[in-house]
Amino acid sequence: MSANENNLIWIDLEMTGLDPERDRIIEIATLVTDANLNILAEGPTIAVHQSDEQLALMDGWNVRTHTASGLVERVKASTMGDREAELATLEFLKQWVPAGKSPICGNSIGQDRRFLFKYMPELEAYFHYRYLDVSTLKELARRWKPEILDGFTKQGTHQAMDDIRESVAELAYYREHFIKL
């Protein structure tokens, strides 16, 4: 394994809600692919501890989803806060991609980046300023070639590592059926 500036860093966060001023990160996962979307390594999947008071602020959808997946219990049991999760993630990424080289990759990744900027600024700064957002291709396909949309189905577990794997697979699907490389 050696750091390669062409590798891509994929990330997904699970949060208590969508507002970084009010809500918090409760899970983070990363993986690294090469430029052809082959998964090279999966980083740690970390439940980020939050207080019972913070968890009580979740809306009904988040309570149902994160309780059903077991994430709420993992968050309560976790001993890792934001900073510890950030450092563990950075330690993994530094083995695979030099700082400032990979765009931040994922689905609706701008939302995740807002939370990173607020709660994990060192990790946020590790990425290039560009985005590789799979949801952009989905939106374009919806408008320009809607017949391909039914060809890829997500499981929607709302577990960070599952979601990242699906994002990589979804981009590969669009590469084959929409971009046609």
From Swiss-Prot:
Superkingdom, natural source: Bacteria
Q: Where is the active site?
A: Y129
* Assigned keywords, A-Z: Cytoplasm, Exonuclease, Hydrolase, Nuclease
Taking every annotated instance into account, which residue ranges of this chain make up the domain Exonuclease?
8-171
Chief location category:
cytoplasm
Does the record carry Nuclease as a key word? yes
Entry similarity comment: Belongs to the oligoribonuclease family.
Its biological purpose is as follows:
3'-to-5' exoribonuclease specific for small oligoribonucleotides.
Q: How does it assemble?
A: Homodimer.
**Name by which UniProt lists this protein:** Oligoribonuclease
| Organism field | Escherichia coli O157:H7
